Swiss-Prot record:
GO terms for molecular function: adenyl-nucleotide exchange factor activity; protein homodimerization activity; protein-folding chaperone binding; unfolded protein binding. GO terms for biological process: intracellular protein transport; protein folding; protein import into mitochondrial matrix. This is GrpE protein homolog 2, mitochondrial. It comes from Homo sapiens (Human). GO terms for cellular component: mitochondrial inner membrane; mitochondrion; PAM complex, Tim23 associated import motor; TIM23 mitochondrial import inner membrane translocase complex. The gene is GRPEL2. The keyword Acetylation applies.
Length: 225
């Protein structure tokens, strides 16, 4: 075994020497020779830029980038300040609009109520303590006509502004619209759980209940044994 290994090693050495001789006969430097390493090192050094130019170029690039970033920061700061000013102006304008809406929101309603007040004033002028007995009948007729006109005007004003009167006789009891006063026995033709009597009318404004109707609700009467 040792002889075979020795023989194989000799063959390898002989082949390597023959290969080296043929390589040098052609004038080519050996791949692992000192000349080859020197030439490769010189080629690498010739391609590298001088070390003296590296730091100044990097520093200059950083300065340019810093100036650019500083300009961007200044621009963003100006935009941010303008946005804050615009938001503040919008907030003040909105607040002013809300205050005006609170003050003048019922302006139209008040204007219509003034006409109702005029009718009421003219009606009261018809009543005088110094009126003669024979004129009392005529005065009462005028007052009655004035009250009818006043009621009609109020209904017109309420309808114009979305104010709806609730008179829920016969309707099913609804705690969101009705205030229960008491229960009463259900009479003929009256269903239990429905409104039998309205003590005070309720009102809705644009579909929202602003005053509950005070009602009496019918219940099934108990049979006596």
């Amino acid at each position: 075994m040792a002889v075979r290994s020795l023989w194989a090693g000799r063959l390898r050495v002989q082949r390597l020497l023959a290969w080296s001789a043929a390589w040098e006969s052609k004038g080519w430097p050996l791949p692992f020779s000192t000349a080859t390493q020197r030439t490769a090192g010189e080629d690498c050094r010739s391609e590298d830029p001088p070390d003296e130019l590296g730091p100044p170029l990097a520093e200059r690039a950083l300065r340019v980038k810093a100036v650019k970033l500083e300009k961007e920061v200044q621009d963003l700061t100006v935009r941010y300040q303008r946005a804050i000013a615009d938001c503040e102006n919008i907030r003040r304008r909105t607040q002013r609009c809300v205050e005006d809406a609170k003050i003048f929101g019922i302006q139209s309603f008040c204007k219509d109520l003034v006409e109702v007040a005029d009718i009421l004033e003219k009606t009261t002028e018809c009543i005088s303590e110094e009126s003669e007995p024979e004129d009392q009948k005529l005065t009462l007729e005028k007052v009655f006509r004035g009250l009818l006109l006043l009621e009609a005007k109020l209904k017109s004003v309420f309808a114009k502004h979305g104010l709806e009167k609730l008179t829920p006789i016969g309707d099913k009891y609804d705690p969101h619209e009705h205030e229960l006063i008491c229960h009463v026995p259900a009479g003929v033709g009256v269903q239990p759980g429905t409104v039998a009597l309205v003590r005070q009318d309720g009102y809705k404004l644009h579909g929202r209940t602003i005053r509950l109707a005070r009602v009496e609700v019918a219940v099934e009467s108990q049979r006596r044994l």
